[in-house]
């Protein structure tokens, strides 16, 4: 059975309960369909290499459990509200936290897994699907001390049991902030400027709201397809999985939602962000992909026509300007960046390590055939004699410049 809700005033359809017909085989892995997105793409939840997996979470060479953010010594942190961010900026205010200049540890882990396993399938994934890290404050005042404040999902899910697919929604048709915050709407860079464009790869985590739509309940066991594998066992064994959704700052500790394993089947609870949990990635396949075969069952999952394509990562560092970033480019195509000089610099290149071309604010590196790390710098504006005169410039003898030259 499919259910209907809305995202961005667009009808979307989702699976709930003990769904048995939402299995997909894509990119060499099994996935469960969560829902459609407002851009028409289809959101999938990772289920590993088998429909019977009891370890449907990603693993690195050394571990399979991750806290939200580690410091440079590898110590998990929860002593600042900014650590509920999938990305975060600097401390001191919500506005600062939402600058999204630093990757969380869980984002680094997910990005690493994607880079190692899914890069050739990037062309099939949506760049405009939104992955929500709702940091809207509902009650209390932002602080770094012992005073509690709560984020949007606490009001929606814990107080009212009214989930929403709209990031930052109060579930009443409006927003907790003055307007919807694009800083919490994670997307990859896209031509339509949807979301914040901060993701390097089109992958993230499930939200607590999506879990509730799927049949999850706050502080209660809930046996639904998120929990079950095709053998009606826990997809993650005893492991809990992190969602992308923060809940509160509580007595000097940052707290987020987690979904538990077989010890408390399907229980949607909370955990301090310095706890370690497992990660089940979420991706969104484009709406126009061609169905190849299957009926969605575990025995005969939907299979999408998706031939892996050589895809390369191009990193650009912009000195004396803005536009530093990373793009994924199919072999033989061009890498394009939007760049701009800082004040005092002009739209001309001083250095250009990869030989790209600059046209206005568009910088292009043609015919990508390998991974690249490139850098450019802009030329500094020269100081004219007129500017010196206007600034009352004098020479070493104390005389002002005079005349036309």
Give the residues covered by each predicted segment.
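Long, domain-scale functional regions
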Residues: 1-309, 382-405
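Append "Rare intracellular matches occur via the same short Y/T/C beta-strand/loop motifs
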Residues: 283, 335-339, 371-378
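Short proline/glycine- and polar residue-rich coil/turn motifs
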Residues: 329-331, 367-368
